[in-house]
Design a protein with these regions (language model features):
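N-terminal signal peptide c-region/cleavage motif recognized by signal peptidases
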Residues: 16-18
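N-terminal, motif-rich segments that launch catalysis or mediate targeting to/interaction with membranes
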Residues: 20-182, 189-327
Length: 327
């Protein structure tokens, strides 16, 4: 162990561990599920792709925790893939030049009115007629980044870049990060629509960001759904679920993933209490109250979130396996 590494380790042990937000936790969980299901050859190939990332040293190697740095190669590789899944969120805070180059805010979510095929609208309408649907383009390869406007298209575009041997090594590395991240995002219900009302939210509540709760807002509450669950125990349950699942039973249609998240939002996320309060506040012209959200709601939210992230990890595994097996 080098002197620098020894000092870093000592300092790390003296500092409190930072709490992981649900975003980082969920993206690492789904990436770890995929990692542990892939073969050693596939894992090595992913790391070879990732090493060509334009910001590999500063955003990956320099960010690796000391306890991971001194561990075995498999643990380091798994952490790197998890960091790749988190990386698109890191791009939000880059210096201006790199933020413009890498940050794509519109890729993380989708307008609730955007539909393709038999998809369900993602919006919950309270006291107002539904907005007209936007009929999205048919499934197919997207050749240009300018054609990508939402999470569905982001998944399809980045899978294509990663799969295309003509893509530059740097482009493939960045696309790997985005694919890992967006497959997680589309499984979060509040990334797929919003609550729309006539007075408070005529253009939508931005996926729950306009609904105050004792944890911040509804979106951040869902973002924090797994924050207090033991990470390793949660990962073991997800890995066990994947082992008990036949790959042929997993629906790999991105439109289906979108539909699943929207069904959760329609049926559970926005409670009758929230909808009634929106109508009452609009009638009285008052602001919304802060919603407590009872233990039953929070428990169900945690169970749903774990199931959605588990599905994301399984689907990432199958998608990466297919891409890596492509000649």
């Amino acid at each position: 162990m080098t002197f620098r590494l020894f000092i870093s380790l000592c300092l790390t042990l003296l500092l409190p561990l930072p709490a992981l937000a649900w975003d980082a936790t969920s993206h690492r969980l789904s990436a770890y599920v995929a990692w542990e299901a892939l073969t050693p050859a596939h894992r090595n190939r992913l790391l070879q792709i990732l090493e060509k990332h334009p910001r590999y040293e500063q955003d990956f190697l320099d960010q690796m925790p000391v306890n991971v740095m001194v561990s075995d190669e498999d643990t380091k590789g798994r952490w790197l893939l998890g960091q790749a899944a988190v990386w698109p969120d890191l791009a939000r805070s880059f210096e201006e030049e790199d933020r413009i180059r890498y940050n794509r805010p519109d890729w993380h979510w989708i307008d609730g009115t955007w539909m393709r095929g038999d998809a369900l609208q993602g919006n919950v309408y309270v006291g107002v007629d539904p907005l007209p649907s936007i009929h999205g383009e048919a499934q197919g390869p997207l050749e240009h980044e300018e054609d990508v406007h939402n999470v569905v298209q982001g998944i399809e575009y980045n899978a294509g870049v990663l799969e295309n041997p003509a893509s530059s090594p740097a482009a493939r590395a960045v696309a790997l990060c985005w694919l890992l991240h967006l497959v997680g995002d589309i499984h979060q219900p509040l990334h797929t629509g919003a609550l729309v009302s006539s007075g408070l939210f005529p253009e939508g509540d931005r996926g729950g960001n306009g609904i105050p709760t004792r944890f911040g807002n509804l979106h951040s509450t869902w973002d924090g759904a797994l924050r207090n669950q033991p990470f390793d125990d949660t990962l073991r349950r997800m890995n066990s679920a994947l082992r008990q699942t036949s790959p042929g039973m997993i629906d790999m249609n991105v439109d289906t993933w979108l539909q699943e998240s929207r069904q959760v939002m329609q049926e559970f996320v926005y409670t009758d209490e929230i909808k009634a309060a929106v109508l009452r506040s609009e009638r009285r012209r008052t602001s919304l109250p802060t919603f407590a959200l009872d233990d039953d709601y929070l428990g169900t939210m945690q169970a749903i979130s774990e199931d959605r992230i588990s599905h994301a990890g399984t689907r990432l595994y199958l998608a990466l396996r297919r891409i890596l097996n492509t000649p």
